């Protein structure tokens, strides 16, 4: 197939994704139908009979779109935008859960205040009854007549041989009178302190909740990075060559020049946008949509190319030459 004249680029496909900003950034799956079919892919029929993307099938019937962030052109914003897109639904769910938990917490707080107030009222009544009993007991014991009756009762029990002779002695009576008060003052044997389960549960939620959220977000970002490995060449992708100059009109599109080499996402990563392909520049710094009739697919790549960027360790080593390190050590 011969390339179209470079001085007359074809008309752009309809930008159906302009009105679909609220959909996810990448919608997997493909639709098949008429429109912008190209039979320039080598190999067996992957998207249509007789050609990879050809055979008159093309990209048609797509109904997906992009969210309000879309695909930016800045190399530094790809990771943040990708992480935001992948984690937006999770954070909305977390926000709903937090709101529900806050409502339940407010309800439990109100219930706790009501129960605590009622409990304090009951405890106050019991305390007043206890004080009344103490006052009545002191009044009864203070009366001499009741003391004589008490002594007579103890003497009668001794006479009837129901108690030992020492039961009616003054020392025994004094001990029997003071024993209840000593028990109240000293108290019974203390039981071991129990575990404060509400406090333990609070610390588990306070510490484990943020950690769990961090783990979930990390897994989502990692999954998003796995999906975009094709942009850097670390995963299977298609290589395309630009046939015309294209200037992006919004953040969802990718600008490129005539003759520039692009990486096209595989089938499962392509969004459902009719007449457009998800592609990236050669270094993977920019990702966006490109018109399908402005590029020509060269072939499929399944192996990772050599790394074009230095790792953090290499950057550190290059920043400190060997002679500087040796001089510092000496």
UniProtKB/Swiss-Prot annotation:
- Per the record's keyword annotation, is Cell inner membrane included, yes or no? no
Transmembrane residue ranges: 193-213
One example of a Gene Ontology biological process annotation = protein import into peroxisome matrix, docking
Q: What is its main location?
A: membrane
Mind telling me which InterPro entries this protein's record contains?
A: Peroxin-13_N, Pex13, SH3-like_dom_sf, SH3_domain
Domain named SH3: residues: 235-300
Renumbered to this chain, the Pro residues biased-composition regions fall at: 1-14
Q: Which CDD domains did the record assign?
A: SH3_PEX13_eumet
Subunit structure and binding partners: Interacts with PEX14/prx-14; forming the PEX13-PEX14 docking complex.
Protein's name according to its UniProt entry: Peroxisomal membrane protein PEX13
């Amino acid at each position: 197939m011969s390339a179209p004249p470079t001085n007359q680029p074809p008309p752009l496909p309809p930008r159906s994704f302009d009105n679909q900003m609220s959909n996810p950034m990448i919608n997997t799956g493909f639709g098949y139908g008429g429109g912008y079919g190209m039979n320039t892919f080598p190999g067996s029929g992957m998207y249509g009979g007789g050609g990879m993307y050809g055979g008159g099938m093309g990209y048609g019937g797509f109904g997906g779109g992009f969210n309000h962030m879309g695909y930016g052109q800045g190399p530094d914003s790809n990771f943040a935008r990708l992480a935001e897109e992948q984690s937006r639904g999770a954070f909305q769910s977390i926000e709903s859960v937090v709101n529900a938990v806050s409502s339940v917490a407010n309800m439990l707080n109100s219930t706790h205040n009501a129960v605590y107030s009622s409990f304090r009222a009951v405890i106050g009544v019991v305390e007043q009854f206890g004080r009344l009993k103490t006052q009545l007991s002191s009044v009864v014991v203070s009366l001499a007549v009741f003391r004589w009756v008490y002594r007579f009762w103890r003497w009668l029990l001794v006479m009837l041989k129901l108690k030992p002779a020492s039961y009616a002695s003054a020392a025994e009576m004094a001990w029997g009178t003071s024993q209840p008060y000593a028990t109240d003052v000293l108290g019974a044997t203390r039981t071991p302190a129990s575990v404060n389960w509400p406090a333990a549960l609070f610390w588990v939620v306070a510490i484990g909740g943020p950690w769990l959220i961090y783990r979930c977000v990390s897994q989502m970002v990692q999954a998003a990075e796995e999906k975009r490995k094709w942009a850097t060449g670390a995963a299977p992708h298609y290589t395309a060559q630009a046939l015309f100059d294209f200037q992006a009109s919004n953040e969802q599109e990718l600008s490129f020049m005539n003759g520039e080499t692009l990486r096209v996402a595989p089938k499962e990563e392509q969004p459902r946008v009719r007449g457009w392909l998800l592609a990236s520049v050669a270094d993977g710094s920019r990702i966006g949509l490109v018109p399908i009739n402005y590029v020509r697919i060269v072939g499929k790549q399944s192996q990772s190319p050599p790394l074009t960027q230095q790792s953090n360790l290499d950057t550190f080593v290059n920043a400190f030459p060997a002679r500087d390190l040796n001089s510092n050590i000496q």
